[in-house]
Structure formats: structure tokens, C-alpha cells
Amino acid sequence: MLSGVQPTGSLHLGNYLGAIRNWVAGQAEYENYFCVVDLHAITVPHDPAELAANTYTVAALYLACGIDPAHATIFVQSHVSAHAELTWLLNCITPLNWLEDMIQFKEKAVKQGENVAAGLLDYPVLMAADILLYDADLVPVGEDQKQHLELTRDIAARVNYLFARNQPPILKLPEPLIPKAGARVMSLTDGTKKMSKSDPSELSRINLLDSPDEIRKKIKRCKTDPIRGLAFDDPDRPEANNLLSLYQVLTGKTKEAVAAECADMGWGQFKPLLTDAVIATLEPIQQRYNEIMADPSYLKDLLKKGQEQAATVANATLERVKLAFGFTLP
């Protein structure tokens, strides 16, 4: 299994509940590669100092959230040069219109206007290289990444067709791993939008490193409605559904139990319950994070070991592809 998070902005509850917690739950079942995808982070304008600091923060949060180095290889994408090299090879056989049709590119290109970089168009090919280098069987994806995984499969199939027709395939076609729960945590300021690091409002998300006071402030100010009594699945009350679902996932209670508990509540009663659940979830993560960051050499050594382990696998795949393309090897 392979997955990763960009070191841009702060990791938030959506990243944890929608992705990282699921990685932790399944890590003993798979051979895992968890990457800090810093090459993806520079496809939009970025601050170099923040990128460097956030790279270590994300790696430390992987560990603090429960990723076990005994069950996973943790590494930084740019530390393994095969990612960039395979991306170029895949670029040369990927039709341009495949990339122009990607929904995320269209959305982000509109925001950037004339300043849109070629790297943003090429983002899905880099993602394909990330996945294909490790012969990944499963890739955890949310709804917003399904199209990128489909493109990865198309690119792998094209390589196999062009260079290994009637022969064993060169690249493995990965399958999506869609989480059963917690897959979509919504914004605190708009229950119809996904919680996002890129949202300009800090009030829209709860970051994994937010203090208890910051958490209380954000939940106190989060968008609600004037209706007393809280219920799931009312299309006219997206915020109620979002906050109840968040409470359910954090407490581990059943949907039916939460519905019964909160049926007659007002927001003034419910928000302290949600606040306590968030703080209780994040407290051990923050404690472990602080311990890791207090020992920088441990984190750097772990990432160096991860780079070596990842490069061994990635370079073997890259060599296989280069030979298929007709390159000579040194």
C-alpha cells in the first residue's frame, strides 16, 4: 500500500480521519510506503522555508498518529530521485489531452490564471510515478483522487501495451482502497465543502496541532443553524450532518446512538461534547509529536533509512522501465 500527504499548510482532522487513521488501522496487513510528497507541493507557488519545515512536521505527525516504522517505510519524495526520472519517461507516452481533462487541473488553473505552471498540468503523471514505482496493489483514495488513480492505471496499461505486448507486464495496475468511514470531513464554515488546508479561513478546519483553546474557539464559531434538535442526513442541514458525523467518528459510537443522544439537543449543549471529543483525540497525538520533534536526529535518521529502503524498490522498477524503453544502463 502506498500513500502520502503534501507538506503544505497544517495537517487537519480531515487528513487524520479521512486518511492517516485508516493507514494506521491497516498497517499490519500490508507492506506500506508512506511518503511526504514535497515534489507535488511545488506545483503551486510556495515558500521554501515553510516547505522544509513542513516536511519534517508531516513526517513527525505520521509517527505521532500511529504509523509504526516496523510496518511502514516513511520517506520524503524528493529524496528518491526515481520519482522525477520515471515521471519524465511516463510524460513521453502520456497523451496531452489526458492531462487537460483532469478536473483538479481545470479547477486550480482557473484560480492561478496566466500564472499556471506546467508542473500543475503534470501533477497526475508524477502521482502515477509515485504509485507505479512501488508496484502498489492498493492506493487509499478519496473521491477527489479517484480520477488520478484511473489515469495511473491508464498510463501503466499504455506502457505495457507499447513495450510489453504479449509479454509479462512491466508495470502493475493498482486498485483503489476506499475507506469505509471518516472518508470526508467537511469544513467548519461550510458543511457542503471538504475540510481543506488551502481554505483561506483558519476557522474552517481543526489542525492536528491546534491548542485546546484554539479548538474551543473554532467549534464555538463553527457554522450551525437555528433549529433545535440535531439529526443526520437532512439535505437542508449540511452542518448538522457534518458535526454529528465528526462526533460519531471521534467517539466511536454508532450512528443510532449519536442520533438518540443528540435528538433533543441545541447547539449550546452539543458543541462542548464535540470539543471534548476533539481535544481527547488530539492530546496523545500532540504529546507524541512534541517528543519526536525534541529529538531531530531520530527523525532525520528515520527518513534516511526510509529513503534507502524506498530507493531500493523504486530503482528496480525504474531500471525495468528504462530497459523496456530501450535505454542502455551504466
UniProtKB/Swiss-Prot annotation:
Location in the cell reads: Cytoplasm
**Which Pfam families did the record assign?**
tRNA-synt_1b (PF00579)
Instruction: Indicate the transmembrane segments per the record.
Output: none
Q: Give the motif span ('KMSKS' region).
A: 194-198
The entry marks the following residues as binding ATP, namely: Q6, P7, T8, G14, N15, G142, E143, D144, V185, K194, M195, S196, K197, S198
Q: Which GO terms describe its biological process?
A: tryptophanyl-tRNA aminoacylation
Q: Which GO terms describe its cellular component?
A: cytoplasm
Respond yes or no to whether keyword Nucleotide-binding is given for this record.
yes
**Gene3D superfamilies in the cross-refs:** HUPs, Tyrosyl-Transfer RNA Synthetase
Which EC numbers characterise this protein's activity in its record?
6.1.1.2
Per its UniProt entry, which superkingdom is the organism in?
Bacteria
Q: Which reaction does it catalyse?
A: tRNA(Trp) + L-tryptophan + ATP = L-tryptophyl-tRNA(Trp) + AMP + diphosphate + H(+)
Give the record's keywords alphabetically. Aminoacyl-tRNA synthetase, ATP-binding, Cytoplasm, Ligase, Nucleotide-binding, Protein biosynthesis
| Motif residue range(s): 'HIGH' region | 7-15
Asked whether the UniProt record includes DNA damage among its keywords, one would answer no
Q: How does it assemble?
A: Homodimer.
Known role: Catalyzes the attachment of tryptophan to tRNA(Trp).
Q: What is this protein called?
A: Tryptophan--tRNA ligase
What species is given as this protein's source? Thermosynechococcus vestitus (strain NIES-2133 / IAM M-273 / BP-1)
